[in-house]
């Protein structure tokens, strides 16, 4: 079997409608298409995805194509918030490119504040936490308006500190604290030219509305991208839930308590990586709107995955080039010439019989320039690469997106 996507997206969408549907079966095996491990330049497929898709799908496609890992997970929302904090101090073409890459318009600061407030609202049944911080080298003179904007709209904690080993430890400790210990560190060192770090941390923990019975979990084969089979703990249950299928994919909703859901996406046998990305770009939200209530026999693996990546090249490919060069315009931050020298993101996700837990930290480093209706029965056996999406029904922002090609890969 060729390379196929397993996408992890913790996201936010409008409520999905439920209704009955006509009976059709969808039990074909899924084969993908080998993708190129490169993010340099816009391929025709990437350009098409970007033209008709959304930030999360374009970013994930670039990261996934550039990774040799079978399991990939990123947080578009964490990246977007960290980048928006930084863009608040950008001017001219630099700011324009950053917002265009994220496909953002309007009052970005106000929108970011609303997103943070809606996602982090108190929820007794589901835990979602967002935290932002800015760590400034005490030698850098930062403009007051930039600091005030990030405090007011992003709730950012601002620290003026010496850039030494003690501060490195504090930054990594902040990451661990804000992700309940799931992301223990984000930085290995502080380089001599670095003057500022802008961090976002995102944490999610939700319990299934209907848990899997652990007694029904069995060791079963999972077919990896190269056709090899590995035995994994496969969870099983039958549930009445929202469901959609077309010639390219199946989608089923696995609801959490507290208003979130995980969308599980299983590509068809004929749908490869590039085709799936383009299909999602053009049809994803319309597919969600067409989901109907079915009785789904669901099998999916229990798994845990950690992933780390640089988003620098994908973001440059998406058009935000000037922010990463010596001609970057961040004079809204400081009169000292600065540019983004890297965007690092680490993620964690765990899925088991009781629910799911996920975390992400994005670090941007700035350096000196140089009543149930009758329902239809469906079968969905996730014993090969598939996609999963966790959504909150109120907002419309992607929190996490990832890929698992082998549940045994840590």
State each model region's role.
Residues 342-410:
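C-terminal soluble interaction/assembly domains
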Residues 94-98, 272-274, 307-309, 359, ...:
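Extracytoplasmic/secreted cell-surface and envelope-processing proteins
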Residues 69, 111-268, 289-372:
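Non-catalytic, conformational "gating/processing" segments within enzyme and secreted inhibitor domains
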Residues 267-292:
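Internal alpha/beta scaffold segment
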Residues 101, 279-283, 314-321:
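Conserved short hydrophobic interaction patches
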């Amino acid at each position: 079997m060729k390379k196929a996507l397993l996408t992890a997206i913790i996201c936010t969408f409008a409520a999905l409608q439920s209704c009955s549907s006509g009976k059709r079966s969808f039990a074909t095996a899924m084969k993908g298409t080998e993708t190129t491990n490169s993010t340099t330049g816009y391929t025709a497929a990437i350009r098409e995805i970007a033209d008709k898709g959304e930030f999360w799908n374009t970013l994930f496609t670039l990261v996934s194509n550039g990774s040799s890992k079978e399991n990939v997970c990123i947080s578009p929302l964490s990246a977007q918030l960290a980048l928006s904090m930084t863009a608040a101090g950008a001017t001219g073409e630099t700011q324009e490119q950053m917002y265009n890459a994220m496909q953002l318009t309007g009052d970005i600061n106000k929108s970011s504040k609303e997103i943070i407030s809606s996602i982090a609202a108190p929820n007794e049944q589901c835990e979602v936490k967002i935290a932002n911080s800015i760590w400034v080298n005490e030698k850098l003179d930062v403009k007051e308006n930039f600091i005030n904007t990030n405090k007011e709209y992003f709730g950012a904690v601002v620290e003026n500190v010496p850039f030494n080993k003690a501060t490195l430890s504090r930054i990594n400790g902040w990451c661990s604290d804000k992700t309940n210990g799931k992301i223990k560190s984000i930085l290995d060192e502080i380089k001599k030219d670095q003057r500022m770090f802008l961090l976002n941390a995102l944490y999610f923990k939700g319990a299934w509305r209907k848990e899997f019975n652990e007694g029904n979990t069995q060791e079963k084969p999972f077919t990896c991208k190269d056709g090899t089979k590995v035995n994994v703990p496969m969870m099983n249950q039958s549930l009445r839930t929202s469901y959609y299928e077309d010639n390219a994919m199946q989608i089923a909703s696995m609801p959490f308590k507290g208003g979130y859901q995980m969308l599980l996406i299983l590509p068809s046998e004929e749908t490869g990586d590039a085709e799936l990305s383009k299909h999602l770009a053009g049809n994803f939200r319309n597919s969600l709107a067409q989901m109907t209530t079915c009785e789904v026999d669901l099998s999916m693996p229990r798994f845990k995955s950690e992933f780390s990546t640089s988003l620098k090249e994908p973001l440059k490919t998406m058009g935000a080039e000037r922010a990463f060069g010596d001609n970057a315009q961040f004079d809204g931050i400081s009169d000292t010439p600065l540019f983004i020298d890297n965007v690092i993101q680490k993620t964690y996700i765990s899925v088991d019989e009781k629910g799911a837990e996920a975390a992400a930290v994005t670090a941007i480093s700035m350096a000196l320039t140089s009543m149930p209706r009758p329902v239809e029965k469906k079968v969905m056996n996730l014993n090969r690469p598939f996609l999963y999406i966790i959504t909150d029904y109120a907002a419309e922002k992607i929190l996490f997106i990832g890929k698992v090609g082998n549940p045994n890969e840590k």
